[in-house]
Amino acid sequence: VFKGSTKHPNIPQELSSHGARPNGTTWYDRTNYYETFSASEENLKWALSLESDRMINSFIAKKDLETEFSVVRNEFERGENDPGGVLNERIMSTAYWWHNYGKSTIGSKEDIEKVPIENLQAFYKKYYQPDNAVLTVAGKVDEEKTIALVNEYFGPIPKPSRELQHPYTAEPVQDGERSVELRRVGDV
């Protein structure tokens, strides 16, 4: 979603020209994308236009995978070299046998290197929709104008025809002691 969308084909250039600082993070229950920028009506309109368009019209292209995968691989390797992070991952996988909280949010190295572009595109189309999102606007803004702009940019997006299923897997009762021991070479 950082590469481009139908109305915003060069997102990195636009972010730079607006003096915006973007980022995104993923955790167990959410992914978030954001940008910070100087408070102005022009910047707010631009940001809402950008976010509404990339929510449903992002270029998720095979040609961009290799550069993105190198970024994700680096994040993966940084995590593998963080003893506290590795320990937390092992604790979660011990506590949650079936629930997704027991799985790493970044996935395995094989997931990162071998995921088909079609899977990423299908995930994006299924989950990146207004009915599955929260929009937060903070800063020096006029509340009424901001709500009107949100309606202007996000209102025309049609409600998706798909229905999101709630997870049906139930985590079994933790009926006994569980422990984790992690041993690795290195310094903390």
Question: Model-flagged regions — what are they?
Answer:
Residues K7-N43, R78-N132, P156-V188:
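Non-catalytic beta-strand/loop surface segments
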Residues H18, R54-N57, E152-I157:
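Conserved short hydrophobic interaction patches
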Residues H8, P12, L48, E66-F69, ...:
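Hydrophobic face of alpha-helices
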Residues F69, G84, Q121-Y153:
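Non-catalytic, conformational "gating/processing" segments within enzyme and secreted inhibitor domains
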Residues E41, N57, A61, E143-E144, ...:
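Short beta-strands and strand-coil junctions in structured, solvent-facing domains, enriched
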Residues K3-S5, T36-E68:
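M16/insulysin-pitrilysin zinc metalloprotease superfamily fold
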Residues A47-D53, I147-F154:
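Short amphipathic alpha-helices in soluble, non-transmembrane regions
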